[in-house]
């Protein structure tokens, strides 16, 4: 498979995303005015509550069986490593470049969370369909490759809606805390500076008693709050959809209820799939709509973009090659080179589109997110081609 053929295959899904983003940008422009901020916020809530959970459920229920979980056990581990290593590298980028606090979570998220959704779903079968595909029989390659990509998509959604969701939520809480502290500072500066000194002295013993009580209850309170946060994240609609889909896929009798031509409740799966198909187009045009405002007012510096590009398209693929080849030499992976290709590809993908949904949901850095997505997806056209060529050379 030549470089130019691979360039065409690898660039198609990325160009598709860019075209859909341009549609959203045009609809949100001053000339068109069909997609204002209020419309984008409302659509984003529909994606979060309905479309994304349906997509997670439909993909996991259809593609994941207990046998697949056992034989493909390294894929969840590999994906966890992409999030862990990408998060650490993103943290280094934050420490080196020192961006504004509200951008820190976004930078770590874009470095760690790759687009495990529509890109592998399009890219892997497309490589199988090529006449000179190195992965053998076209129909077998396409069927198996689509299963790998679908499993990757479902797992990626689970990681993104737990780990990445927490990062963006943390940034939003940090911004909220800064705003509240500024309000308190303004109020205290406007308060009566001539207050009675004796009042403060009389209040001191009571303050000390309250402090002791708070210290005693602080540990348990923190533990309860931490468990409450975990429960909230697990009950987020996309995560809940992934968990239910995982259960239906792994339990055979539940799977037989909704999967298959003769399944009595097959309408549930077909409805979920139909709703889930709206996720990627809606997320992409929302991202494009935010892009107009982002290009006008974004605070993203070129060095931040360069740092993320270096992490996603230089450091991560090199580390991924080392991890996958080491795992193969240790006998952890199936002999199928297509499986190993998908594992390497997970280290090379541009940032997840779901990040845009999260920033819109919490109203934090959505303009900057659109700008980062634009540049990373433009670079992805060449990066995916070059690294796919290297992966195929190493595996075949």
Swiss-Prot record:
Cytoplasmic side: 27-45, 95-106, 166-229, 295-312, 359-370
Keyword check for Transferase: no
Name of the protein: Protein PIN-LIKES 5
Stimuli inducing this protein: Up-regulated by auxin application.
Functional description taken from the UniProt entry: Involved in cellular auxin homeostasis by regulating auxin metabolism. Regulates intracellular auxin accumulation at the endoplasmic reticulum and thus auxin availability for nuclear auxin signaling.
Principal location: endoplasmic reticulum
Keywords: Auxin signaling pathway, Endoplasmic reticulum, Membrane, Transmembrane, Transmembrane helix, Transport
Sequence ranges on the Lumenal membrane side: 1-5, 67-73, 128-144, 251-273, 334-337, 392-396
Topology in the lipid bilayer: Multi-pass membrane protein
Xref: PANTHER family: PROTEIN PIN-LIKES 5, PTHR31651
Encoding gene per record: PILS5
Tissue: Expressed in seedlings, cauline leaves and flowers.
Pfam family, one: Mem_trans
Gene Ontology molecular functions: auxin efflux transmembrane transporter activity
InterPro entries registered for this protein in UniProt: Mem_transp_PIN-like, PILS1/3/4/5/7
Effect of loss of the gene: Increased root growth and lateral root initiation.
The keyword Metal-binding is annotated on this UniProt entry: no
Record field: transmembrane: 6-26, 46-66, 74-94, 107-127, 145-165, 230-250, 274-294, 313-333, 338-358, 371-391
GO biological process, one term: auxin-activated signaling pathway
Location(s), subcellular: Endoplasmic reticulum membrane
GO cellular component: endoplasmic reticulum membrane
Family stated for the protein in its record: Belongs to the auxin efflux carrier (TC 2.A.69.2) family.
């Amino acid at each position: 498979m030549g470089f130019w053929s691979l360039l065409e295959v690898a660039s198609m899904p990325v160009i598709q995303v860019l075209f859909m983003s341009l549609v959203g940008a045009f609809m949100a422009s001053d000339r068109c005015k069909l997609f204002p901020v209020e419309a984008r916020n409302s659509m984003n809530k529909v994606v979060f509550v309905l479309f994304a959970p349906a997509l997670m459920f439909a993909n996991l229920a259809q593609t994941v069986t207990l046998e697949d979980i056992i034989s493909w056990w390294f894929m969840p581990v590999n994906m966890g490593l992409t999030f862990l290593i990408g998060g650490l590298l993103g943290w280094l980028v934050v420490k080196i470049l020192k961006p504004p606090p509200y951008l820190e979570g976004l930078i770590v998220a874009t470095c760690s969370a790759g687009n495990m959704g529509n890109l592998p779903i399009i890219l892997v079968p497309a490589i199988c369909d090529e006449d000179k595909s190195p992965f053998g029989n076209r129909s077998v390659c396409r069927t198996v490759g689509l299963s790998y990509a679908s499993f990757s998509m479902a797992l990626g959604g689970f990681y993104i809606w737990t780990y990445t969701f927490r990062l963006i939520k943390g940034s939003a809480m940090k911004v909220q805390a800064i705003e509240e502290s500024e309000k308190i500072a303004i109020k205290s500066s406007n308060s009566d500076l001539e207050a009675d000194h004796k009042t403060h002295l009389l209040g001191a013993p009571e303050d000390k008693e309250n402090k002791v009580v708070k210290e005693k209850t602080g540990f348990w309170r923190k533990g309860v709050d931490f468990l409450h946060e975990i429960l909230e994240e697990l009950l987020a609609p996309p995560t809940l959809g992934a968990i239910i889909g995982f259960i239906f896929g792994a339990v055979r009798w539940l799977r037989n209820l909704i999967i298959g031509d003769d399944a009595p409740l097959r309408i549930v799966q077909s409805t979920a799939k139909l709703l889930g198909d709206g996720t990627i187009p809606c997320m992409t045009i929302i991202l494009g709509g935010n892009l107009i405002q982002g290009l006008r007012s974004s605070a993203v510096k070129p060095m931040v973009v360069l740092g993320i590009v270096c992490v996603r398209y230089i450091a991560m693929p090199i580390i991924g090659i080392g991890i996958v080849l080491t795992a193969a030499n240790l006998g952890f992976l199936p002999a199928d080179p297509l499986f190993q290709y998908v594992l390497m590809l997970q280290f090379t993908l541009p940032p997840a589109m779901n990040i845009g949904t999260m920033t819109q949901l919490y109203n934090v850095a959505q303009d900057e997110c659109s700008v980062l997505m634009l540049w990373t997806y433009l670079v992805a056209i060449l990066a995916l081609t070059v690294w796919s060529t290297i992966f195929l050379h190493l595996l075949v």
